């Protein structure tokens, strides 16, 4: 792809578009650091909703329903640095490697995304340069600063999942996801199951791999950090009361696990 092809495109983000991400608790003292890659559902004005009605962007395909409020509330309780990505995962999925076929999906849960069909190499690169790359650069900058300051980091990737997928009801209230490093995952899985009122998935409803995921392989395993990916079922955090309840539960569990996890760091 020639640079001229990329420069010839109209700007993706305009002055009226929202910021790429929001940082919560920027001076947070906690060792926990929270990432919410799918928190937002915004679309640049130039792309006119990706050609979709708002009702589609409001579905689970457009964002991780409820995870923004849950992450904010948890960050406040823990005094933990957190980043919330603003734009819809249908625009570009910030938890996908650049080579992933679902980085910019043409179809998601049976919905065709018109603005994603037949993208040129330059259009694809424009979204990477405007959204994916600077978002992860900000995370890298924070992790670098903590490393250089000698601060331990316990990394949590915050996600939510739809209760029903392809007609199948999902029984889990939460899922603990991991790839090769199980230090945080196994401790959290046990702690959540010890709550007594939860069905918790072990690498369910999804599993993590280096070809399907970005944050765990790159920010977690790539840096050798103690890390976990947490999934919460969306109907449980669809409103403020559910988000606050889960934030309170997780803050209590994370605080109890902190000494054990820091000893592993």
Q: Model-derived features: where do they sit?
A:
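N-terminal catalytic or cofactor-binding beta/alpha core of small enzyme domains
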Residues: 2-155, 160-265
């Amino acid at each position: 792809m020639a640079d001229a092809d990329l420069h010839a495109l109209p700007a993706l983000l305009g002055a009226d578009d929202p910021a790429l991400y929001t940082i919560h608790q920027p001076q947070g003292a906690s060792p926990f650091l929270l990432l919410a890659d799918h928190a937002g559902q915004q679309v640049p004005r130039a792309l006119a909703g990706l050609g979709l009605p708002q009702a589609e962007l409001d579905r689970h395909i457009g964002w991780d329903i409820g995870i923004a409020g849950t992450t904010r509330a948890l960050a406040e309780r823990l005094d933990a640095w957190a980043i919330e990505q603003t734009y819809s995962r249908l625009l570009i999925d910030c938890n996908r490697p650049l080579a992933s076929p679902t980085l910019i999906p043409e179809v998601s849960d049976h919905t065709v995304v018109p603005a994603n069909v037949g993208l040129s190499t330059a259009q694809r690169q424009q979204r990477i340069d405007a959204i994916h790359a600077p978002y992860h650069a900000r995370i890298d900058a924070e992790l670098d600063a903590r490393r250089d300051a000698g601060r331990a980091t316990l990394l949590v990737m915050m996600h939510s999942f739809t209760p029903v997928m392809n007609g199948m009801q999902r029984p889990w209230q939460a899922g603990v996801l991991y790839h090769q490093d199980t230090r945080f995952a196994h401790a959290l899985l046990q702690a959540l199951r010890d709550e007594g009122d939860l069905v918790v998935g072990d690498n369910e409803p999804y599993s993590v791999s280096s070809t399907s995921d970005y944050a765990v392989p790159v920010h977690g395993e790539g840096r050798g950090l103690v890390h976990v990916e947490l999934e919460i079922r969306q109907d449980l955090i669809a409103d403020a009361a559910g988000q606050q309840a889960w934030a309170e539960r997780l803050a209590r569990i994370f605080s109890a696990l902190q000494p054990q996890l820091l000893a592993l760091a």
